[in-house]
Amino acid sequence: ISACLVGSEMCIRDRDMNRKFKKLGLTCNVGTECEFYLFEKDDRGRPTCIPIDFGGYFDVAPLDAGENLRRDICLTMEQMGMAPQHSHHESGNGQNEIDCRYAGPLKTADNVMTFKQIVRAIAMRNGLHASFLPKPLPQQAGSGLHINLSLYMDGKNLFEGDIAPDSVAGSFMAGVLAHSRELTVFTNPLPNSYQRFGCDEAPRYVSWSRQNRSQL
C-alpha cells in the first residue's frame, strides 16, 4: 500500500505527473476550500434536512454550533499529515468551510478524499450527518469545492501581474475554459450539482475574472 502513496518513488501516478511537469518546466500547486452542511439526525439515526444552527457567514458561537466539531476535524487532519489553514461558518444555516494548504495535484486529490472521510466520521461520532451535496437545501447557499491553482516556472508565480493571452498562464486558463464541458463530468457529476449553478457565488459564465465569483 505504501508504494501507492504520493511521494513514494514507486507511486506510478506521482512519477508520471512529475515527469510531465518537469518536461514543461512547471511546478503546480493546488489548494482547496471545501464546504459542507451539518444536519441533525432523527431518533432512528437517519439524516434529516434540519441544519444544526441558523448562523450565517463568519458567525461565531453560540450562532455557530459547528465550531468545536470543525476544531476536532482540523486537529485530526494535522494528525494525519494534512495542513488545515482556515475554518469558519459559511453563509448557509449549518454550513461550514475548511480550507487546506496547497500541495501537489495528486497529494491534494488524495487529501480531499481523506478530508471527506474525516468530516463524515467526526460528524457521526457527534450524532450528526455531514453532507457534501452541492445544493442540499433549496433556499440556502450551495456548497462548493473551490480549487485554487498556481503555476511556477523557475520559482516565479506565472499568475502574478498582468497575464498576456499568449503567455503560459494565459494558455493554461484558455485550456481550462476550452475543456469546461468535459471537466463538468468530474466537477459536477450529479443532477443536484446544476441546482447550485447561477446562484450566489456559484459559477454562471464560462469565462474568467480576478474578482467576480460568478465566473467559472
Task: Identify the residue ranges that each predicted region occupies.
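Secondary-structure boundary elements
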Residues: 23-29, 75-83, 107-108, 115-131, ...
